[in-house]
Amino acid sequence: MMIHGFQSSHQDFSFGPWKLTASKTHIMKSADVEKLADELHMPSLPEMMFGDNVLRIQHGSGFGIEFNATDALRCVNNYQGMLKVACAEEWQESRTEGEHSKEVIKPYDWTYTTDYKGTLLGESLKLKVVPTTDHIDTEKLKAREQIKFFEEVLLFEDELHDHGVSSLSVKIRVMPSSFFLLLRFFLRIDGVLIRMNDTRLYHEADKTYMLREYTSRESKIANLMHVPPSLFTEPNEISQYLPIKEAVCEKLVFPERIDPNPVDSQSTPSE
């Protein structure tokens, strides 16, 4: 679980023609949460919902991609078969106490599992999503390069009524000639299941596209008896033990009508 300081911050960083923005602030107010829950047709939202938190990568021409909690929850499938676990009924009952206790609770994914891969920005100009067999060069990422900028943004987190955790966070690091982003949805239902949906985004300054890789991993706890339980709470450590259920590789191709380097800007952070 992440440690939450809840200190508001806003950081901008220039990387060639790109402006990288990381905004972090407090959790949403209850009135705003209720309004958004109605809009999303969900009985409740994650306990810690950071609706104004965002990590944005935007080109000087206007197109780009951003990552936010609201759009991530729009990708939650409330109509597929729900997880049937011992804690589900108890957990849902705890969420229906109070003024809405007499309402009929429609089925929804109480784990908040999302396959969100980011929100494309721009109106007339947008990134074009193209399937590819190319992969992110992990060896390049292992190279010792100076980190010019790093930020991590929590989008939502829920402890599932003390039965585990469901969280979504995004982090980015910028090197002299490239940037790498990881969006991670992590779900642990104690004694039942571990699930991890990762979206990786990589761009090299001399390329006219970004590479985006999405992987979904999952395993029942019963199939992880050979793994030390201490790793169940460590996403980076447990991922290697989770079988891949889905993998998608895409290129996010820049619009043809733009100069990939419209401005000669320096890679400098600003508060």
From Swiss-Prot:
Sites of Phosphoserine modification: 265, 270
InterPro entries: Phosphatase_reg/MetRdx (IPR051330), TIP41-like (IPR007303)
A biological-process GO annotation: DNA damage checkpoint signaling
Compartments in which it is found: Cytoplasm
Keywords for this protein: Acetylation, Cytoplasm, Phosphoprotein
Molecular function per GO: protein phosphatase inhibitor activity
Residue ranges, annotated region (Interaction with PPP2CA): 173-271
N6-acetyllysine modifications at: 106
GO CC terms, sorted: cytoplasm
Pfam short name (any one): TIP41
Record text on subunit structure and interactions: Interacts with PPP2CA. Interacts with PPP2CB, PPP4C and PPP6C. Interacts with IGBP1; the interaction is dependent on PPP2CA. Associates with a protein phosphatase 2A PP2A(C):IGBP1 complex. Interacts with PPP4C and PPP4R2.
Entry's family note: Belongs to the TIP41 family.
Task performed by this protein: May be a allosteric regulator of serine/threonine-protein phosphatase 2A (PP2A). Inhibits catalytic activity of the PP2A(D) core complex in vitro. The PP2A(C):TIPRL complex does not show phosphatase activity. May play a role in the regulation of ATM/ATR signaling pathway controlling DNA replication and repair.
Name by which UniProt lists this protein: TIP41-like protein
Native source species: Mus musculus (Mouse)
